[in-house]
């Protein structure tokens, strides 16, 4: 699996990511060609130059906005612009995910609905080029997984459209909270992490921590715009994962309930899954004074904790929720489709170290085919397993 590691020892910004990707070999001509899909010709110019930061070489990408008063584009306009473009589906998906995180942070900072967010500091033209360009570069490098180092908090003050703001600026803090990003001080008093850089890391990184075992292929160095007491360089490590299954951070919410209608508990579980929880389950327990109750457990992405927690408080009688973060190890997974006498059925395939360790027919497909042909579900399931085994043996059935 191709992995990209964001080394943010000196910080991260959109232009630094772009510079590092170009330093990794992303052709500038290809990048410009892909960015044309946004229809921003005449609104910006992209310049690239080799520079030094504290004596270390790096590539600096400079996005110059040509309009002195560029329009403030609302989130919905940016969403439509990217979704309706000719960009590759994977580039669109990553770009929209980054902008959505950015919009969520801005909405929380300014206390406005998500759909009314307008991008000013972060946005519009330069943010589009930085974010979409970074996603184009990751796609060109065929990166499947992103991991990031902790982020430096920086310090001091910056001038913005809203006046002087303390570093880190509010949008960056919101993004860090969203992604449960580990932070530290490297002693430098400057803006080291921009909202665009934080959004790229929070949206794209599956985990934050040390670099995993890699067979290193390339290291790209993207320069920041200023000289600092330390090399103002973002390093991008590209390599193949070695020997370890991917790990990711999950949030676990738990609460005990002994005074709620069981029908409401069933409804709560369904709705939590609809809100984005990965798994929801209950266990029977005995509580104080011998009362029977249930332990409700929710496993969800860290960014879904606020919504899941609010829903539990609103719909149940609990007075408190425990939450923790855990690491989980996951196998590489893919979906393959087989032909059976009852139609097509998806097979969920799990791999470890490049070898298949498990393959199971998708149960929903089996149910649908069984209902269509009026046969037992087990009959369809066995037919799908047989078709999969034939494929493994080289028979294209």
From Swiss-Prot:
Disulfide bonds: none annotated. Keywords: Nickel. Gene3D superfamilies: mk0293 like domain, Transcriptional regulatory protein pf0864 domain like. GO terms for molecular function: lyase activity; nickel cation binding. HAMAP family: LarC (MF_01074). Belongs to the LarC family. This is Putative nickel insertion protein.
């Amino acid at each position: 699996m191709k992995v990209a590691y964001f080394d943010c020892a000196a910080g991260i910004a959109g232009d630094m990511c772009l510079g590092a990707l170009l330093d990794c070999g992303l052709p500038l001509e290809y990048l410009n060609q892909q960015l044309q899909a946004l229809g921003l010709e005449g609104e910006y110019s992209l310049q690239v130059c080799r520079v030094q930061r504290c004596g270390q070489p790096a590539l600096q990408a400079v996005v110059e906005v040509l309009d002195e008063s560029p329009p403030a584009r609302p989130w919905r306009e940016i969403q439509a612009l990217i979704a309706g473009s000719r960009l590759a589906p994977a580039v669109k998906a990553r770009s929209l995910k980054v902008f959505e995180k950015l919009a969520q942070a801005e909405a929380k900072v300014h206390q406005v609905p998500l759909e009314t967010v307008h991008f000013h500091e972060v946005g519009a033209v330069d943010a589009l080029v930085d974010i979409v360009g970074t996603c184009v570069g990751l796609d060109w490098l065929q990166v499947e997984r992103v991991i990031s180092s902790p982020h430096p908090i920086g310090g001091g003050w910056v001038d913005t459209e809203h006046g002087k703001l303390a570093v880190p600026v509010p949008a960056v803090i919101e993004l860090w909270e969203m992604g449960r990003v580990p932070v530290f001080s490297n002693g430098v008093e400057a803006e080291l992490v921009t909202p665009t850089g934080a959004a790229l890391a929070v949206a794209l990184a599956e985990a934050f921590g040390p670099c995993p075992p890699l067979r290193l292929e390339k290291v790209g160095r993207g320069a920041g715009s200023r000289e600092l007491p330390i090399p103002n360089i973002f390093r991008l490590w590209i390599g193949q994962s070695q020997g370890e299954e991917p790990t990711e951070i999950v949030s676990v919410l738990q609460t005990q309930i002994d005074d709620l209608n069981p029908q409401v508990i069933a409804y709560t579980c369904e709705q939590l899954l609809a809100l984005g929880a990965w798994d929801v389950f209950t266990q029977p327990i005995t509580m104080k004074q011998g009362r029977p109750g249930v332990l409700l457990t929710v496993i969800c992405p860290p960014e879904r904790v606020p919504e899941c927690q609010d829903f539990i408080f609103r719909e149940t009688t609990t007075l408190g929720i425990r939450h923790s973060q855990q690491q989980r190890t996951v196998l590489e997974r893919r979906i393959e489709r087989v032909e059976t006498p009852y139609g097509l059925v998806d097979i969920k395939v799990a791999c470890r170290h490049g070898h298949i360790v498990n393959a199971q027919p998708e149960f929903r497909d089996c149910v649908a085919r069984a209902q269509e042909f009026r046969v037992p579900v087990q009959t369809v399931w066995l037919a799908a397993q047989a078709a999969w085994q034939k494929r493994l043996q080289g028979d294209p059935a």
